[in-house]
Amino acid sequence: MKVENRTAALADAVAWTSRVIDARPSNPILAGVKLEAIAGTLQFSAFNYEISARHHIEAGVDEAGSVLVQGKLLADITKSLRSEKTYLVTDGSTLTITSRQVEVHLAAHARHRVPGSARGTGHARPSRCPTFVQAVNQACVAVSREENRPVLTGVRMQFQGDKVVMTSTDRFRLARATFTWTPQNPDVDTTTLVRGSLLKDVARALDEHQNIRLDFDADSPTLLGFENAGRVSTSQLIDGEFPAVDRLFADEYPIQAVVNKQDLLDAISRVALVAERNAPIRM
């Protein structure tokens, strides 16, 4: 492999892809980022059994090829480079990174396999990214941190025609957000359960100036894919039965009040000063 890259684009792509790598991976392969040079692009991919990431940038490819290197180390190295151009060359089990006066040699694996992303019939045309991010932030409010109950750590996503309903609960709170999308199959009716922490991580990494595309197998979903600005994230779905909470959401509420958010938060904070930890506050 012999590739010429723009340093800024290379560093950004490596940083985004390597974010899914665990701090202490159980398998050395899971500590790596796969680089593949082909047809004028340099492709990046990483995986951690729960979420995968794929990205690509334009590059000058003199020799096609692929290699697996330590992702976090590669991210630190590329972030420190200051030259406009960076060159990547493989020679056997070594990746050489050259950028002006800097030359770094990294141990590499030539044989590797990083799982791909979700592919299915339920994917949609691009949707507005800010709308999706807002829905994720609202729906994840009530996600539980109890790892011994995996179902409560997830957000249920119900795809019903052009509507997506996101719900979470930790047994004490409920959160729900709804947004519209444009599915390729207008009659799609599928429910998925995705880990809330992964969903928030995906939302944080999105480019909100670009649209987002969701992808899954509508008949038997096991993965949920998110594509945005050339970046693809895939999340493993949680296998379990989400609590029946729909009846707790009323279609109409007889009493409604519109208040200033900060005023409400300030009032609650003052009252909570004299309340015991986790004690309820009457409103």
What positions do the PLM features span?
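Structural preference for solvent-exposed beta-strand-turn elements
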Residues: 1-283
